[in-house]
Amino acid sequence: MKTYPKIGIRPTIDGRQGGVRESLEEKAMKMAQAAKKLIENSLYYADGTPVQCVLASRTIGGSGDAGIVQQEFTGKNIVATLSVTPSWCYGTETMDLDPNTIKAIWGFNGTERPGAVYLAAAMSGYAQKGIPAFKIYGHDVQELDDDTIPVDVQEKILSFARGAIAVGQMKGKSYVNIGASSMGIAGSQVDISFFEDYLGMLVEFVDMTEILRRIHLEIFDPIEYDKALNWIKENCREGIDINEGKDLPDIVKKSKVIPADKDWEFIAKQAIIIRDILYRNEKLGDLGWEEEARGRNAIAGGFQGQRQWTDWLPNGDFTEAIMASTFDWNGPRQVTAFATENDTLNGVSMLLGTLLTNKAPIFSDVRTYWSPESVKRVTGKELTGKAKNGIIHLINSGASALDGTAAAKDKDGNKTMKEFWNMTNEDVQSCLKATDWCRANYEYFRGGGFSSHFKTEAELPVTLIRVNLIKGIGPTLQIAEGYTCVIDEDIHQILDERTDKTWPTTWFAPNLGECGFETVYDVMNHWGANHGAFVHGHIGSDLITLASMLRIPVTLHNVPRERIFRPNIFEGAGTKALETADFEICRLLGPLYKK
């Protein structure tokens, strides 16, 4: 039975017997029940199951009650606690001091009882002890009999819960490297300490020859293979063959060992085998392959591909694209953050984005900044709308989740990206129809294969994400909220064909105005690597909250100050230079799972 990470709800009160405690019991419990209902009705785990909370059986008026509740929570995979109170309580006697939980307190903003006073006292206690805790306090005074949760409080509770559940879902899971370093890309040279210390994850290594072994020995479900291949033939239409008419060098011609008309058969096997490597598949045990049936306990992974694989075998573009999509030949299903070129840091960027949204992460090269002047010079036309200040060309070398087509529709008929459990058959078919599969350019991919080719055809709010590693500092996070752009078709065609017309394209315009985001050029210039991952929605504030839980400082973002939500201890390092305070507190606290 699957054990989900949960949030413990702790109602705390003034413990004085003889009228005080008795007058607070009902209100405190109502607050706790309301918080539990809000979280469980709003948030979902990556598999679509509603998030679960555990409500304490009693209110907490002192250390005796706190100890009983701690015992109740033991063994239930409580990753975080939310303490709620309408009144003064006894500071350190009622606080959650478990070193293994992420903490928040919601203090009721009312006049009859000083919930805000306890909140401040508890935050002072946490700061003295060097324990980060999130402070939740409503903007407006409420009446004592008002049992609603104000909107601003709801937003903070949900941001805290989203981040905490993301932390819990990563803990103990694996990132599976299939292959090793790709083309000298530093992000594909995995840093095991980063995964262990900051994410609580294991790192698994699987040589790419394992795929060939399983193909040769037929270590895969033959029924699943037939289903996948038939689905591909029915739904994955082929696009252009960029190799037609070329006089290719002999070294290219003799490098392709899988005949072109057998590419899809090889690719279908590759896709199901890589999925089996990451996850459990009991069908393999039925076939006698019990060790392989157990999988690698994965939550994310990546495939090296270039060049030791792609120089002679069909590339991994289909596998990479379909793993990260919200569907495959079995219909809608949970996405997997799966990185091209095994860029582990972009794989983590994908993972953070998809855990916060439950939507497909789109892997891209942060390829080119196109200024309005350059576009006018090259195309004779001007950029307009969201694109008017210039655009960044997000384009991957053949593999991006098909949700990036923006062909799915919301209830009002608008193009969007969805969680897998909201994807309809019409949505799936629309994404497939908006994608064609172009034969790989043999000059770059001698072994052939097919690239997912589409363009994002909707103006959607998105957030571009990148985790970087800096020697002496450690991991850092970059965030750019903005919009995908629909540009003039003539402009698109000219710009797209200057790069590679067989690859998936998204035109991105970041929101400008914040420091580091003075111009679109500045964003491109500040970006820390050649790759980025974007997800649907403006989730920069949630990413900042999650990063603070993991103790990863944010070096670039365009989230307005009023949306930033970090533990109260961060304000202890200053309220003017927030970036400096972020670095200082993350350094002081150290990684979440520091040894």
UniProtKB/Swiss-Prot annotation:
GO annotation, biological process: D-arabinose catabolic process; L-fucose catabolic process
Disulfide partners: none
Source superkingdom: Bacteria
Ligase among keywords: no
Catalytic activity line of the entry: L-fucose = L-fuculose
EC numbers on record: 5.3.1.25
Principal place of residence: cytoplasm
Gene3D superfamilies with a match to the protein in the record: 3.40.50.1070, L-fucose Isomerase, Chain A, domain 2, L-fucose/L-arabinose isomerase, C-terminal
Family listed: Belongs to the L-fucose isomerase family.
Protein name (database record): L-fucose isomerase
Organism: Clostridium perfringens (strain 13 / Type A)
Species lineage: Bacteria, Bacillati, Bacillota, Clostridia, Eubacteriales
